[in-house]
Amino acid sequence: MFLTYFDAMPRRVLALVSLACVALLAFGLYLQHVVGLEPCPMCIVQRYALVLVAVVAGITAVAKSRGLLITGSGLLVLLSGFGAFVAARQSFLQWYPPEVASCGRDFYGMIETFPLKRAIPMIFKGSGDCTKIDWTFLGLSIANWSFLCFVAIALVGLVLITRLARQR
C-alpha cells in the first residue's frame, strides 16, 4: 500500500518533499523572469516558507534518529501550515478584493529589511498586487496552487509523524 512507503523510507519521502519545493521555487522564478509576472509581497512570503520547508525537509532527510525525523516532520507541518495560511489569505483577497487594493505594505517592509533579502535579492524582489490574478492553470491561480501544495506537504508531515510515532 502507499502508506508503507512512509514506513519503509521516511528519509526518501522527505528528500522528495525537499526536491518538490525546489522545483516549485524554480517554477516561480520561471514565471517571474521568463514569463514576466511580478510577485506580490504575499508571494514573496510564500517563497520564504517554501525555502524553509525545503531546508527543513532536506536536513531532516539526513537525520539519523527517529526523534529527529519526528521533530523535523513536525517543523515541516508548522512551516507548511504557515505557508498555507498566507496562500489562503491571498486566495481570499483574490476572490473578494477590497475596494482599495492592498496586501499589507507594512508586511512588505518587514520582508524588505529581512537579511536574506540582501543575500538573494533576485529571488525575493517583487512589487505586484496581491489581489491580481496574473496566471491560472485548470482554473486555479498561483495562490490556489500554492495553498494546495502547502497542504499536501503538511499532510505528508502528519503522516510521517503518525507512522514514525507508531513504530516506537
Curated annotation (Swiss-Prot):
Main subcellular location of this protein, as a coarse class: membrane
Write the record's keywords in alphabetical order, separated by commas.
Cell inner membrane, Cell membrane, Chaperone, Disulfide bond, Electron transport, Membrane, Oxidoreductase, Redox-active center, Transmembrane, Transmembrane helix, Transport
Top-rank taxon? Bacteria
Q: In Gene Ontology terms, what is one molecular function of this protein?
A: electron transfer activity
Residue intervals on the Periplasmic side: 31-48, 89-144
The family note in this entry says:
Belongs to the DsbB family.
Question: Which Cys pairs does UniProt list as disulfide-bonded?
Answer: 40-43, 103-130
Q: What is this protein called?
A: Disulfide bond formation protein B
GO biological process assignments: protein folding
What Pfam families does the record point to? Answer: DsbB
What species is given as this protein's source? Polaromonas sp. (strain JS666 / ATCC BAA-500)
Positions of transmembrane segments: 14-30, 49-64, 71-88, 145-163
UniProt keyword Transcription regulation present = no
Tell me, in a sentence or two, what this protein's role is.
Required for disulfide bond formation in some periplasmic proteins. Acts by oxidizing the DsbA protein.
List cellular component terms (GO): plasma membrane
